[in-house]
Amino acid sequence: QPMRVPKASSKLDYEAELAVVIGKTARHLTAENALDCVAGYSCYNDGSIRDYQRKGTQWTLGKNFDLTGSFGPWLVSADELPKGAHGLKVQTRLNGQLLQDGNTADFLFNVSQVLVIMSEVMTLEPGDVIITGTPAGVGYARKPPIFMKAGDICEVEVEGIGILLNTIANEVS
Protein backbone atom coordinates (compact mmCIF):
# COMPACT_ATOMS: atom_id res chain seq x y z
CA GLN A 1 0.00 0.00 0.00
CA PRO A 2 1.39 3.42 -0.87
CA MET A 3 2.22 6.04 1.70
CA ARG A 4 0.13 9.16 1.07
CA VAL A 5 1.07 12.81 0.80
CA PRO A 6 -1.88 14.47 2.58
CA LYS A 7 -3.93 17.18 0.92
CA ALA A 8 -3.16 19.46 3.88
CA SER A 9 0.62 19.52 3.31
CA SER A 10 3.33 18.58 0.84
CA LYS A 11 5.97 18.11 3.54
CA LEU A 12 5.94 14.31 3.97
CA ASP A 13 9.35 13.26 5.30
CA TYR A 14 10.84 9.77 5.68
CA GLU A 15 12.22 8.36 8.94
CA ALA A 16 13.80 4.90 8.95
CA GLU A 17 13.20 3.26 12.31
CA LEU A 18 13.50 -0.09 14.02
CA ALA A 19 10.12 -1.41 15.16
CA VAL A 20 10.03 -3.46 18.37
CA VAL A 21 7.05 -5.81 18.61
CA ILE A 22 5.95 -6.79 22.11
CA GLY A 23 5.19 -10.47 22.69
CA LYS A 24 4.00 -10.57 26.31
CA THR A 25 2.45 -8.24 28.84
CA ALA A 26 5.06 -6.21 30.72
CA ARG A 27 5.13 -3.45 33.31
CA HIS A 28 7.96 -1.88 35.34
CA LEU A 29 10.71 -3.60 33.41
CA THR A 30 14.37 -3.46 34.41
CA ALA A 31 17.49 -3.37 32.26
CA GLU A 32 17.98 -7.05 33.09
CA ASN A 33 14.54 -8.29 31.96
CA ALA A 34 13.37 -5.69 29.42
CA LEU A 35 14.18 -7.74 26.33
CA ASP A 36 12.22 -10.74 27.65
CA CYS A 37 8.96 -9.17 26.44
CA VAL A 38 10.13 -8.69 22.82
CA ALA A 39 8.58 -11.01 20.23
CA GLY A 40 10.55 -9.60 17.34
CA TYR A 41 11.60 -6.69 15.19
CA SER A 42 10.54 -5.11 11.93
CA CYS A 43 11.07 -2.02 9.77
CA TYR A 44 9.11 1.19 10.19
CA ASN A 45 8.92 4.34 8.07
CA ASP A 46 7.68 6.99 10.47
CA GLY A 47 6.42 9.36 7.80
CA SER A 48 6.22 12.81 9.33
CA ILE A 49 4.36 15.90 8.18
CA ARG A 50 6.96 18.47 9.17
CA ASP A 51 4.92 21.67 9.05
CA TYR A 52 2.24 20.08 11.26
CA GLN A 53 4.88 18.82 13.69
CA ARG A 54 5.95 22.41 14.19
CA LYS A 55 2.43 23.73 14.90
CA GLY A 56 2.70 22.98 18.61
CA THR A 57 5.01 21.82 21.36
CA GLN A 58 4.32 18.13 20.69
CA TRP A 59 5.10 16.34 17.44
CA THR A 60 2.04 14.09 17.64
CA LEU A 61 -0.05 16.04 15.13
CA GLY A 62 2.54 15.58 12.38
CA LYS A 63 2.85 11.85 13.06
CA ASN A 64 -0.78 10.81 12.72
CA PHE A 65 -2.06 11.64 9.25
CA ASP A 66 -3.78 8.75 7.49
CA LEU A 67 -1.41 6.45 5.59
CA THR A 68 1.75 8.48 6.18
CA GLY A 69 3.55 5.72 8.09
CA SER A 70 4.41 2.19 7.09
CA PHE A 71 5.37 -1.01 8.94
CA GLY A 72 6.75 -4.39 7.89
CA PRO A 73 6.96 -6.35 5.71
CA TRP A 74 8.54 -8.97 7.97
CA LEU A 75 8.62 -9.78 11.67
CA VAL A 76 11.95 -11.32 12.62
CA SER A 77 11.92 -13.10 15.97
CA ALA A 78 14.14 -11.64 18.67
CA ASP A 79 16.30 -14.77 18.85
CA GLU A 80 17.29 -14.40 15.18
CA LEU A 81 19.06 -11.06 15.73
CA PRO A 82 21.77 -9.80 18.07
CA LYS A 83 20.52 -9.14 21.60
CA GLY A 84 18.40 -5.98 21.58
CA ALA A 85 18.85 -5.72 17.79
CA HIS A 86 22.18 -4.03 18.59
CA GLY A 87 24.61 -3.17 15.81
CA LEU A 88 22.21 -3.31 12.84
CA LYS A 89 22.41 -0.91 9.89
CA VAL A 90 19.33 1.29 9.43
CA GLN A 91 19.01 2.97 6.03
CA THR A 92 16.63 4.96 3.86
CA ARG A 93 16.82 5.19 0.10
CA LEU A 94 14.55 7.55 -1.82
CA ASN A 95 14.41 6.77 -5.54
CA GLY A 96 17.60 4.75 -5.08
CA GLN A 97 19.57 7.52 -3.35
CA LEU A 98 20.94 6.64 0.10
CA LEU A 99 19.74 9.39 2.44
CA GLN A 100 19.97 7.79 5.88
CA ASP A 101 22.75 5.44 6.94
CA GLY A 102 22.76 4.75 10.66
CA ASN A 103 23.20 1.91 13.10
CA THR A 104 21.20 0.76 16.09
CA ALA A 105 24.45 0.90 18.09
CA ASP A 106 24.29 4.69 17.76
CA PHE A 107 20.73 5.17 19.06
CA LEU A 108 20.37 7.68 21.91
CA PHE A 109 18.53 4.95 23.85
CA ASN A 110 18.98 1.24 23.18
CA VAL A 111 15.96 -1.06 22.93
CA SER A 112 16.22 -2.16 26.54
CA GLN A 113 16.30 1.45 27.79
CA VAL A 114 13.29 2.38 25.65
CA LEU A 115 11.28 -0.55 27.02
CA VAL A 116 12.19 0.28 30.63
CA ILE A 117 11.03 3.88 30.16
CA MET A 118 7.85 2.92 28.30
CA SER A 119 6.90 0.30 30.91
CA GLU A 120 7.20 2.91 33.67
CA VAL A 121 4.43 4.86 31.92
CA MET A 122 2.15 2.12 30.62
CA THR A 123 1.58 -1.60 30.48
CA LEU A 124 3.05 -3.07 27.32
CA GLU A 125 0.73 -5.58 25.67
CA PRO A 126 1.31 -8.31 23.07
CA GLY A 127 1.13 -6.77 19.61
CA ASP A 128 2.21 -3.30 20.72
CA VAL A 129 4.72 -1.77 18.33
CA ILE A 130 7.32 0.63 19.68
CA ILE A 131 9.51 2.56 17.29
CA THR A 132 12.96 3.65 18.28
CA GLY A 133 13.82 6.93 16.60
CA THR A 134 15.61 7.69 13.37
CA PRO A 135 19.22 8.20 12.28
CA ALA A 136 20.57 11.45 10.88
CA GLY A 137 19.68 12.37 7.32
CA VAL A 138 15.96 13.15 7.39
CA GLY A 139 14.73 15.26 4.51
CA TYR A 140 13.71 18.43 6.31
CA ALA A 141 17.23 18.83 7.77
CA ARG A 142 18.87 18.78 4.33
CA LYS A 143 19.82 21.88 2.38
CA PRO A 144 17.62 22.21 0.41
CA PRO A 145 14.99 20.09 2.21
CA ILE A 146 13.80 16.89 0.54
CA PHE A 147 10.21 15.73 0.93
CA MET A 148 8.56 12.67 -0.56
CA LYS A 149 6.17 13.28 -3.44
CA ALA A 150 3.80 11.25 -5.60
CA GLY A 151 5.69 8.78 -7.76
CA ASP A 152 8.67 8.43 -5.40
CA ILE A 153 9.82 5.06 -4.11
CA CYS A 154 11.03 4.95 -0.52
CA GLU A 155 12.93 2.00 0.94
CA VAL A 156 13.65 1.55 4.63
CA GLU A 157 16.11 -1.23 5.34
CA VAL A 158 17.11 -2.70 8.68
CA GLU A 159 19.97 -5.17 8.48
CA GLY A 160 18.88 -8.73 9.24
CA ILE A 161 15.20 -7.84 8.85
CA GLY A 162 14.68 -6.73 5.27
CA ILE A 163 13.45 -3.86 3.15
CA LEU A 164 10.16 -2.01 3.57
CA LEU A 165 9.35 -0.55 0.15
CA ASN A 166 6.60 2.00 -0.40
CA THR A 167 5.51 3.97 -3.40
CA ILE A 168 4.34 7.47 -2.59
CA ALA A 169 0.97 8.74 -3.80
CA ASN A 170 -1.20 11.76 -3.19
CA GLU A 171 -4.11 11.47 -0.78
CA VAL A 172 -7.40 10.89 -2.57
CA SER A 173 -10.85 11.96 -1.35
Predicted regions and their residues:
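A generic local secondary-structure boundary/capping motif
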Residues: 3-12, 18, 26-33, 60-63, ...
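Catalytic-pocket segment enriched in acidic/His residues
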Residues: 50-173
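Short, structured patches in soluble enzyme cores that scaffold and shape functional sites
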Residues: 7, 16-24, 42-47, 75, ...
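Sequence-level detector for tyrosine residue identity
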Residues: 14, 41-44, 52, 140
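Generic structural signal for residues positioned in beta-strands
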Residues: 2, 19, 40-42, 70, ...
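Short coil/turn connectors at secondary-structure junctions
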Residues: 8-9, 14-17, 36-39, 88, ...
